[in-house]
Amino acid sequence: RNGLPGPIGPAG
């Protein structure tokens, strides 16, 4: 979602 490969959302 946010473009960060973290717990918030996948990269993209």
Swiss-Prot record:
Keywords, sorted A to Z: Extracellular matrix, Secreted
Subunit structure, interactors included: Trimers of one alpha 2(I) and two alpha 1(I) chains.
Protein name: Collagen alpha-2(I) chain homolog
Function: Type I collagen is a member of group I collagen (fibrillar forming collagen).
UniProt similarity note: Belongs to the fibrillar collagen family.
Record's GO cellular component terms: extracellular region
UniProt keyword Transmembrane, yes or no: no
Native species: Crocodylus siamensis (Siamese crocodile)
Location of the protein in the cell: Secreted, Extracellular space, Extracellular matrix
